[in-house]
C-alpha cells in the first residue's frame, strides 16, 4: 500500500471553500478540505471515494442526489458541464489555483499524478492508460447499459438486454485472461486501474441480474476483486454518504432526472 508523499498533506493546505452558490448543499464537512468530492453512491464515484481513502487526501464529500436532478442545477454545471458525477474541485491545483476535474478516469489520473501514488512503474504507463481506457470506454459503459435495460427501460427489450450482458461477459473474459499469472491489472503493484475495475465489479450482481455470483466463471477476475475489496480503505470508501438521505423512489421525476434525453422538450 502506498502512502501519500510528504508535502501533499499538511499545514500548507489552504482551507478555502467554493462559494455556496457554486456547489450543492448538504455537505459532509472535514477539517481543512483540499478536495471537494461531488458524488452519488454509484460505481463511478465509488472509484474516487476509494482513491481518496487509499491516499489519505483531505476531502469534503458533497452529495449530489441525481435522482432528484441536482446534477442539472446551473451551480453544478459550472463544475461539470456534462451534469454527471463524480466531479472534484481541488483547492490546491496546478500553480496553487482552484481546479475542477470531472469524469472518473480523468479524476483518477489527476489525483494519482498529483500525489505520485498508485501509478505503478513509469515503464508501465502505456499499459496503465490502455487498461484505464478499456474500463472507461468498455466495461463501464456496457455495465451501465446492462443495468439500464434490466431495471429502467420498458420490459421486453430482450435484444438490448442480451447485447449488453454479453458485452459485459466479454469484457470480464478479456480481463480474466489478462490476469492469468498476475496479481494486478498493470505491473506488480496495486494501481488506479484496479480501483477503476473494482467500481463496476462491485456491482456485478446488479449488472448481471439473476446471477448469484457472476464472477465465478472468471476466477482471475474474481480473485482481483476480492483482493481489492479486502483492503481497509474499501470499508471507509463505502461509508461515505451512508447517512445521507438519497432518494430511493424510482418514479417518473427520477426517470426524467436520470435520463433527460428520453424526455425532449417540445418547442412552443
Question: Model-predicted segments: where are they?
Answer:
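GST-like fold's C-terminal all-alpha helical module
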Residues: 120, 132-232, 236, 268
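Short, Lys/Arg-enriched N-terminal segments with co-localized hydrophobic residues
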Residues: 16-33
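Phosphate-coordinating loops and pocket residues in cytosolic domains that bind phosphorylated ligands
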Residues: 78, 230, 239
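Extreme N-terminal basic, low-complexity initiation segments
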Residues: 1-12
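A conserved hydrophobic position in a structured secondary element of the catalytic/binding core
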Residues: 20, 102-103, 229
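GST-like domain detector, emphasizing the conserved glutathione-binding G-site
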Residues: 32-163, 176, 255, 266-268
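Acidic/histidine-enriched, glycine/proline-rich intrinsically disordered or flexible terminal extensions
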Residues: 241-268
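Short, solvent-exposed turn/loop segments enriched in Gly/Ser/Thr/Pro and often Arg
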Residues: 65, 192, 241-242
